[in-house]
UniProtKB/Swiss-Prot annotation:
Encoding gene (name): fimB
Name assigned to this protein: Fimbrial assembly protein, serogroup E1
Source species, domain of life: Bacteria
Entry keyword set: Fimbrium biogenesis
Native species: Dichelobacter nodosus
Lineage summary: Bacteria, Pseudomonadati, Pseudomonadota, Gammaproteobacteria, Cardiobacteriales
Amino acid sequence: MNKQRFLFAAKISGIHFLLSFVVALALAGLIFFVWYPFPYQKIMGSFKLFFLISGIDVCCGPLLTFILSNPQKRLKECIIDFSLIIFIQLSAFIYGMYNIYLARPVAVVFELDSIRILSKGDILLDELPQALPEFRQFPYFGHHLLAVRGWKNAEERKEGVEKAFQGFDIAQRPTLWVAYSSELEKIRKAAKPLAQSFSKLNAKQQQDVKTALQKARLNMEEAFFLPLVSNRSMEWMVILDKNMNITTAVEIDAFEL
């Protein structure tokens, strides 16, 4: 590669890299502030998936541009080359973003003694038409905040046991979903006072809790907690205020407290 071609290719691929980086940065804002706000990006593993996809995409596109760029090529050849590169890059990026979108949390559900984060793939979709009307569709942005109601009769309980053997816990069944606000008394009974368990934490965990409370502007004496679980992690704790509103979360195994 002569100097003229090298400088030309470096300039074009540099512009391509900059544009790709700006697009990736904008999509990162959508992912980490809308689809996966804290703590979901850590619990659901979206950081690794996004950086893998965007890293490959942002690097490979400009690299192909650098290899194929040549000032001696005719305009038609350049158009064909760049169209092919853009097609490959967009296809990979759209595929990756689609999978990130599908894996996003669509429901946060209180079940018995914990709060479970669910993506679309975790849910028994066959039951979705039988859910309450307001919960039959998943929001494009954000998630449903739900709780699980009690059994109506013995037959429903038996069906619940059968579904559990099939791999679907009660939180994963839309027919049992109700609004989170309708089960506040059950949530209050299940939640534990944070102050009573604080001494059981190690020094790092105590500092993490203090930092989380400070950011949430919540006093220790008014804070409660429940385990926060997903199919990827069981080692998180959600912190609630005195009204059982979810305020923040800390990476601590709450089942041990």
